């Protein structure tokens, strides 16, 4: 049997990514040459491996160049498309943005209170005009950043011996797949918000981001932007105020405010506020201590009301546990009775009463589990004083001038001024932690002012008031905040105390200024130039400031010293020309009865006369006919019975509450006086200046002037008429404290008769007016002074007069 041929061992399989060449093609003899041959073989293998690696490197570089070219071409195409669609897209984007965020938007009720948009990164301008547009712009900038720097494809393994061909091709396939996913995920949508509604694109972007290396810096930036976004949203929600009659806000706690969770005081340092490009506050500090009553004073138009609104809207960082209320709008006119409008302001009480009714219904149906919760509800109602709520609301309304019938009258039956009183009553009824009142006496008569003055003297929570009524500030306030030179300055005590301290401070500043000017003059006389003298003086001030800082360890005054400026004295002086003597009586009503058609008479059988030296203040609640009495004295109304008698040479100067109706709005103040009294140009301007109207306002149309400026034009007109009798109906409205003082001094110096209706207690007391009370269709003179009248008013309301020592 022939032997089978000897089988050769199987050829080893060659693993590689090139051509498979078997080493068995060459017969190798055993012996010393074998080692030499094997060494030559591995040397050849190393050479081949090196060549293959270089080829792969070249291919990889070409592939990367192609990818970069594709990205650049795509970017150019998108840029060209974006330029063509920019106008259309921008309008569509902002329109869609406002629709999506409509519930969070703030109505532009006041131009001064616009919330400034956050500054975009890198100094780029935002496309939108609000905070949301700025945030969307930041998001689009991040997407463009990712397009400029796409994720790098996975690198292929260099070890060709340990990799199979299928495994080597896999990275390339993955890179291709990743490129396709990126091209899908990063394709620009038709607008910025399409990506928010496309879940598939969001998932693809998340897959790509998982493959990218972590970017902690970018994540932190996004987190910070999100926190800022939430803060802005909370601020805008608060500013919206749901079109309510007053602003009540409670902001979300930020990380910084969390440290102040239980804070009862407000401490804000170095804040700035600007409006219409005008800086109102620069590096100002706000300090409000709990349970103190502050009066905020300063010239008109400098930002007092703006500050109150920023606090109410929490544009400034107010501790979150302090609830803030700014009473600034009248209640809605509807079928709700006035007393119910006040009671409904306490939403917590309403919820407890509703829960009480629900739990009682459950008990009646045999549900005994509600008993425990009902007991807790009763305890909460007792703690909030719910049983006495209606009595408290009616007491407040009565003090503000509402009789029992008016308290049950629907709010739509009241005028705007009376609805404003209802709004004030709601604010007093709610008792917030910080109550802010902006000119609360403007819509009140004297009796209501007396009651409010007395009521707020017993206020136990924090109070911040803006008012031009010096008597009101003297009685109510424990501290004064003075807005001056874009800063807030604090004085302990009432307004009278502040006035004395401020005058002393101004005298000291004037002395320092004069000393500085003397030093500068000496340096100039010694050969120094003006610039050198000022520099040397500043250096001396710097040394003095550093010395004081070391002595007092004062870290607040870090600003570079500036040369002192002459202290500005805000002085207003009203003057009325003295009339010639007239024989008495110069004016009077004799047997006068008057009533409007279809109504019961306001007056019956009035009989009195007025002399040239009379000083009369007519007082009484709203609606009794005080303004009507003035119209009868001026001859603008004719009595139903009886007659008005006056001296044939008598000239009457009448200041009406609706003084704007007598002005010609298209004229300037100068033109108005020139036309009415044939005055030279300079004389007309001098007359306006005497009543505190700024020189730049002399040549502005009257329709563009503020209420206070228009009032000064009317006072100037009265002076030009040279009246024998001044009849003034609420002349202090829209005047600041300095102007009211000037008016009081002018009345005291005036030689003619004065009849005034006013709710300003200080004007009444400073002019020593006799008090004539209008009540029950008659006019009678009070025996006693103003303090006696206050006591009578409060006793009639069942109140006890608070006697607080002046600080």
Curated annotation (Swiss-Prot):
Q: Where is the composition biased (Basic and acidic residues)?
A: 47-64, 147-160, 206-221, 521-542
BP GO annotations: positive regulation of translation; translational initiation
Tell me the GO molecular function terms.
ATP binding; ATP hydrolysis activity; ribosome binding; translation activator activity
| Location of region: Disordered | 1-221, 521-564
Q: Which domain of life is it from?
A: Eukaryota
Q: Which residues bind ATP 2?
A: 620-627
Q: How is it modified after translation?
A: Phosphorylated at phosphoserine and phosphothreonine. Phosphorylation on Ser-109 and Ser-140 by CK2; inhibits association of EIF2 with ribosomes.
Binding-site residues for ATP 1, renumbered to this chain: 298-305
* Keyword Nucleotide-binding among record annotations: yes
Output compositional bias ranges, type Basic residues.
29-39, 73-85
Identify the residues that the record assigns to the ABC transporter domain, covering every copy: 266-510, 587-802
Q: How does it assemble?
A: Interacts (via N-terminus) with EIF2S1; the interaction is independent of its phosphorylated status. Associates (via both ABC transporter domains) with the ribosomes.
Which protein is depicted? ATP-binding cassette sub-family F member 1
- Its source organism is Pan troglodytes (Chimpanzee)
């Amino acid at each position: 049997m022939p032997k089978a041929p000897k089988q050769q061992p199987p050829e080893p399989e060659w693993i590689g990514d090139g051509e498979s060449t078997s080493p068995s093609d060459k017969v190798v003899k055993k012996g010393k040459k074998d080692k030499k041959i094997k060494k030559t073989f591995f040397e050849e293998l190393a050479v081949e491996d090196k060549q293959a690696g270089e080829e792969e490197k070249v291919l990889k570089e070409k592939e990367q160049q192609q990818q970069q070219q594709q990205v650049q071409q795509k970017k150019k195409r998108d840029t060209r498309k974006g330029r063509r669609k920019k106008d259309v897209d921008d309008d569509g984007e902002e329109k869609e943005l406002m629709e999506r965020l409509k519930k969070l938007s703030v109505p532009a009720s006041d131009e001064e209170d616009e919330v400034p948009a956050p500054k975009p990164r890198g100094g780029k301008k935002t496309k939108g005009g609000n905070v949301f547009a700025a945030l969307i712009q930041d998001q689009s900038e991040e997407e463009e950043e990712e397009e400029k720097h796409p994720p790098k494809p996975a690198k292929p393994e260099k070890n060709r011996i340990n990799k199979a061909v299928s495994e080597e091709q896999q990275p390339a396939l993955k890179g291709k797949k990743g490129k396709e996913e990126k091209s899908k995920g990063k394709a620009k949508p038709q607008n910025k918000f399409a990506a928010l509604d496309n879940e598939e694109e969001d998932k693809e972007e998340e897959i790509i981001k998982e493959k990218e290396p972590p970017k902690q810096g970018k994540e932190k930036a996004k987190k910070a932007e999100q926190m800022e976004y939430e803060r802005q949203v909370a601020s805008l929600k608060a500013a919206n105020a749901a079109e309510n009659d007053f602003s009540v806000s409670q902001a979300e706690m930020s990380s910084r405010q969390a440290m102040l969770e239980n804070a009862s005081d407000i401490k804000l340092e170095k804040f700035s506020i600007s409006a219409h490009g005008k800086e109102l506050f620069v590096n100002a500090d706000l300090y409000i201590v709990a349970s103190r009553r502050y009066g905020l004073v300063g010239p008109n138009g400098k930002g007092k009301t703006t500050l109150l609104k920023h606090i109410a809207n929490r544009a400034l960082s107010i501790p979150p546990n302090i609830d803030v209320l700014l009473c600034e709008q009248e209640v809605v006119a509807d079928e709700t009775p006035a007393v119910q409008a006040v009671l409904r302001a306490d939403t917590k009480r309403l919820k407890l009463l509703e829960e009480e009714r629900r739990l009682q219904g459950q008990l009646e149906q045999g549900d005994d589990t509600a008993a425990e919760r009902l007991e807790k509800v009763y305890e909460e109602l007792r703690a909030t004083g719910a049983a006495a709520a209606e009595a408290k609301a009616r007491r407040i309304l009565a003090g503000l001038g509402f009789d029992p019938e008016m308290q049950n009258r629907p709010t739509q039956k009241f005028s705007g001024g009376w609805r404003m009183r209802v709004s004030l009553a709601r604010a007093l009824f709610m008792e917030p932690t910080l109550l802010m009142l902006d000119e609360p006496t403007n819509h009140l008569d004297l009796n209501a002012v007396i009651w409010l003055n007395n009521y707020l003297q017993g206020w136990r929570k924090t109070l911040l008031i803006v008012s031009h009524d010096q008597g009101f500030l003297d009685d109510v306030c424990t501290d004064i905040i003075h807005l001056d030179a874009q800063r807030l300055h604090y004085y302990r005590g009432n307004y009278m105390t502040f006035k004395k301290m401020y005058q002393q401070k101004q005298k000291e500043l004037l002395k320092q200024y004069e000393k500085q000017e003397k030093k500068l003059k000496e340096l100039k006389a010694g050969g120094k130039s003006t610039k050198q003298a000022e520099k040397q003086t500043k250096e001396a001030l710097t040394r003095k400031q550093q010395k004081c800082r070391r002595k007092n360890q004062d870290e607040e005054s870090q600003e570079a010293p500036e040369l002192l400026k002459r202290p500005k004295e805000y002085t207003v002086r009203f003057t009325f020309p003295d009339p010639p003597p007239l024989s008495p009586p110069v004016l009077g009503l004799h047997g006068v009865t008057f009533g409007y058609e279809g109504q019961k008479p306001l007056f019956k059988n009035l009989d009195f006369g007025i002399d040239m030296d009379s000083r009369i203040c007519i007082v009484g609640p709203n609606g009794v006919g005080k303004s009507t009495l003035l119209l009868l004295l001026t001859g603008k109304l004719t009595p139903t019975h009886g007659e008005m008698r006056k001296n044939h040479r008598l000239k009457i100067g009448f200041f009406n509450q609706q003084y704007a109706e007598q002005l010609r709005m298209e004229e300037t103040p100068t033109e108005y006086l020139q036309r009415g009294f044939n005055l030279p140009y300079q004389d007309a301007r001098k007359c306006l200046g005497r009543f505190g109207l700024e020189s730049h306002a002399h040549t502005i149309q009257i329709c563009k002037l503020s209420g206070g400026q228009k009032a000064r034009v009317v006072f100037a007109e009265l002076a030009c008429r040279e009246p024998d009798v001044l009849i003034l109906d609420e002349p202090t409205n829209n005047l600041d404290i300095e102007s009211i003082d000037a008016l009081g001094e002018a009345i005291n110096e005036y030689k003619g008769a004065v009849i005034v209706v006013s709710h300003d207690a200080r004007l009444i007391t400073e002019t020593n007016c006799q008090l004539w009370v209008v009540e029950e269709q008659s006019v009678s003179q009070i025996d006693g002074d103003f303090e006696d009248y206050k006591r009578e008013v409060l006793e009639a309301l069942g109140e006890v007069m608070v006697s607080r020592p002046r600080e």
